């Protein structure tokens, strides 16, 4: 008796993994650490990491844009962690700034090898500043929000503080702390934690018109650490 031939169903082709922004960033950071240099071309980088050039260009126009976005991601992740603390909304501005810096440098420490590579690899300050442009904008915006909150609580206009000066000061403070952290050889980077506390307290004390003792204390700390 004739029977119908069994047909073999066509094999399903494996669905290609969707490449995310996080995948590209992780692949780039791994690449520079494993090869101790930056990739020469998007084509070669993509091929080595099982993605297409289109996958890369979906998120970044070039490697410069990727490097900037890594710093933006550090900031975003820092704020996400801070806001997960239910008490954060009730913190004073001083406490919010301390929380920001402590969390940011904890994150940098988790990625210390990459951060040291990318900043030291670009020896010229302008190159460093180029990849930090987005971070600078975020930090200044964060500081501006804090000073706006403070000014809203002041009934006397003479007691209000300059948003521009304060936000720029916060960025200069960030650069100083990054350099301090890069050179810090203390266990657990405890000296960086001390620098964060003293610098933030000094900045807020200056803005609260009680600068002298705090500035002197911070100055002595810096002198001791740099001269040790």
Feature-to-residue mapping (PLM):
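An amphipathic alpha-helix adjacent to DNA-recognition modules
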Residues: 18-26, 57-83, 87, 94, ...
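Helix-turn-helix
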Residues: 37-69
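Helical hydrophobic small-molecule/effector-binding pocket
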Residues: 97-119, 134-147
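Amphipathic alpha-helical packing segments from all-alpha helical-bundle domains
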Residues: 129-154, 164-176
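Hydrophobic alpha-helical segments that form the core
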Residues: 161-180, 194-202
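Basic, helix-initiating cap at the start of DNA-binding domains
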Residues: 2-31
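Acidic/His metal-coordination segments adjacent to aromatic residues that form catalytic metal sites
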Residues: 90, 152-158
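C-terminal peripheral helix-coil segments that are non-catalytic and often amphipathic
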Residues: 2-8, 183-228
């Amino acid at each position: 008796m004739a029977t119908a031939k069994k047909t073999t169903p066509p094999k399903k082709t494996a669905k290609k993994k969707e490449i995310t922004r996080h995948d590209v960033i992780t692949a780039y950071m791994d690449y520079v650490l494993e090869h101790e240099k930056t990739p020469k071309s998007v084509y070669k980088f993509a091929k080595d990491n099982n993605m297409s050039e289109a996958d890369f260009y979906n998120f970044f126009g070039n490697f410069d844009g990727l490097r900037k976005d890594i710093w933006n991601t550090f900031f975003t992740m820092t704020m996400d962690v801070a806001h997960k603390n239910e008490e954060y909304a009730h913190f004073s501005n001083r406490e919010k700034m301390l929380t920001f810096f402590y969390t940011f440098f904890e994150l940098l420490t988790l990625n210390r090898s990459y951060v040291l590579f990318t900043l030291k690899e670009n020896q010229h300050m302008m190159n460093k500043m180029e990849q930090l442009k987005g971070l600078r904008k975020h930090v200044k915006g964060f500081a501006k929000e804090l000073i706006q909150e403070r000014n809203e609580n002041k009934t006397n206009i003479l007691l209000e503080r300059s948003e521009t000066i304060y936000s720029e000061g916060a960025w200069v403070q960030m650069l100083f702390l990054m350099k301090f952290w890069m050179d810090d050889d203390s266990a657990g980077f405890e000296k960086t934690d001390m620098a964060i506390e003293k610098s933030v307290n000094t900045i807020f004390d200056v803005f609260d018109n009680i600068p002298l003792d705090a500035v002197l204390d911070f100055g002595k700390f810096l002198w001791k650490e740099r001269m040790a």
